[in-house]
Regions:
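N-terminal beta1-alpha1-beta2 submodule of the flavodoxin-like/Rossmannoid cofactor-binding fold
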Residues: 1-114, 182-212
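Short, solvent-exposed beta-strand-terminating loops
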Residues: 44, 161-177
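Residue-identity detector for glutamine
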Residues: 135, 162, 171, 195-201
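The feature marks non-catalytic terminal segments
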Residues: 157, 176-185
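Short, glycine-/small-residue-rich phosphate/pyrophosphate-handling segment
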Residues: 96-97, 109-165
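Short, catalytically relevant binding-site loops at active-site mouths
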Residues: 90-92, 133-134, 170
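Short aromatic-enriched loop/helix-cap "lid" or pocket-rim segments at secondary-structure transitions
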Residues: 47-50, 138-140, 173-178
Length: 212
């Protein structure tokens, strides 16, 4: 069994990647084969609204017709048995790269003929989000509703899905190098040092049980 991880952050060693690696390690320890793709290393854009995936043609049911680096990612997704997506939250939403991926992947596999899946098997998925805002900010802005909608789309098109949000993450190794006067740095560093290891353990467990 293979689990594909997708890093939706421009950084390859940031919070998104650390969370993804922890979940992937859980999957490995459960016996899964794993692979990680860095989306920001790919060259692709979001949906162009060409509707080629909905036309009555031999292309119907074969995914997005636009050919770019997304094509290979789509093939890797469909060749795997489960997926782990990890993305930072920018301005209340997943990163633009992750959004571009999922809007094309979901829409090209969304049937207008019937409310049924266009794939021939179930693909369990885990969506991991992280943000530097704290839990109070997350609740106040209703960010979790967006994550729940992402899960709804994944379950509508592909199979059982779940999500996790890590909050109060650290953005910089050294805050003194940046204009961050409004940030309560000491309190933030203390909270992150206590909470982030727990978040890593939590997503490890989710990754380990993803195929169970």
């Amino acid at each position: 069994m293979k689990i594909l991880g997708l890093n939706g952050s421009p950084r390859k060693n940031g919070n998104s990647m650390k969370l993804l690696e922890s979940a992937i390690n859980g999957a490995k320890d459960a016996g899964a084969e794993t692979e990680i793709i860095h989306l920001y290393s790919m060259n692709f854009k979001g949906c162009r609204s060409c509707f080629a995936c909905k036309r009555k043609s031999p292309m119907y049911g074969k995914g997005c017709a636009m050919k770019d680096d997304f094509t290979g990612v789509m093939e890797s997704l469909l060749a795997a048995d489960a997926w782990i997506f990890s993305t930072p939250i920018y301005n209340g939403h997943m990163s633009s790269s992750m959004s571009a991926l999922l809007e094309r992947f979901y829409f090209s596999h969304n049937s207008y003929d019937a409310h049924e899946k266009m794939v021939d098997r179930e693909y369990p998925s885990l969506l991991i989000y992280n943000m530097n805002g704290n839990q109070n900010f997350l609740d106040k802005m209703g960010i979790e509703n967006s994550c729940k909608y992402d899960v709804f789309l994944m379950e509508s098109g592909f199979g059982k899905s779940q999500y996790f949000i890590a909050n109060s993450t650290i953005q910089f190794d050294d805050y003194s190098k940046y204009h961050t006067a409004a940030v309560p740095i000491d309190a933030k560093m203390k909270l992150s040092s206590e909470q982030f290891p727990q978040d890593l353990q939590h997503v490890y467990n989710l990754g380990k049980n993803l195929l169970s």
